[in-house]
Amino acid sequence: MSPPGSHACEPMGVASLKRISVLRWTVSVPVVAMIVLALSWGSHPATPLVIVIGAVLIGAVLGAVHHAEIVAHRVGEPFGSLVLAVAVTVIEVALIVTLMVSGGKDTATLARDTVFAAAMITCNGVIGLCLLLGALHRRVATFHAEGTGTALATVATLATLSLVLPNFTESRRGPEFSPGQLAFAAVASLALYGLFVFVQTVRHRDYFLPVTADGAVVDEEHAAPPTAREALTSLGLLLLALVAVVGLAKIESPAIEDGVDAAGLPQSAVGVVIALLVLLPETVAAARAARRDRVQTSLNLALGSAMASIGLTIPAIAVASIWLDGPLELGLGATQIVLLAITVAVGVLTVVPGRATLQQGGVHLALFAAFLFLAASP
């Protein structure tokens, strides 16, 4: 006969081992990434080393998001979603700027392509997946129409100001802003994003908290938050991982462009690759929240990432353009504008009721599939 309590102790031991393995992995990856960065900086690695560096880069991205999640858990919702969104945006800006520095005039549309891809991935891919998971879990996914509608309206306004208007201004020929117009778009984007942060975290915080099937607000999590020491440690490792991502992205940038060319894809696919790489960990986090019946948290992550991608990336690129050579084309093409317009229209119809079924999730995923197909075959 087994000793009393032996079966009860086994799950706890397994859980402890899993936690230790996760802790070791998340602590070691940022350190290893910095070592790899120091050893490979300024070199032109061969193909096998490029693959290794790429794997380390992906690990650094995953590690950064993991530590951002720990910090986010410490500060609670909806602040946590903001921490994740800003961390992901820092990685995105780093990848864009490093590729633009190395690519010159050939990367004039890289910022536009990446930001638009991030908007399509989050507003269609991530939202569609999370609505699907939420509806499968509870037949009907519920969320706050007020908070989600505010976020969607902000994303639509930011996208129009930064990605659509450049096609219709007259100061510059082509889909470009003049320096003054670019400065206005950057300031307006920052102001809108800052206002949304205030609304989400202070003025109407309850609009962004998860809700139950009957509309009751869920203002607490079952898991105990990390200690202040754990949160500070994760903050330090997060900064370390972000530095590693910036440096490794610069080393990997020629390989990314060569891979896109070898696959016969258009140059705009580079932006899609960057957005997919950067948003993959956050997509997993949003899907996990949806499976835990926290669809509102998933929507906060998705729309918050889209908003940060436009509202923070465009100002950062505007500042970086002072030192970058070549033009900065932000205006979308006709096909992309159509996709953006239908995404906003479908998003409004999805958000207004505050409830969504499998059908709404399927519609968003169909739009995401159309975006991917047209990105590969314009």
What kind of region is each of these model predictions?
Residues 2-378:
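Hydrophobic alpha-helical segments, chiefly the membrane-spanning helices
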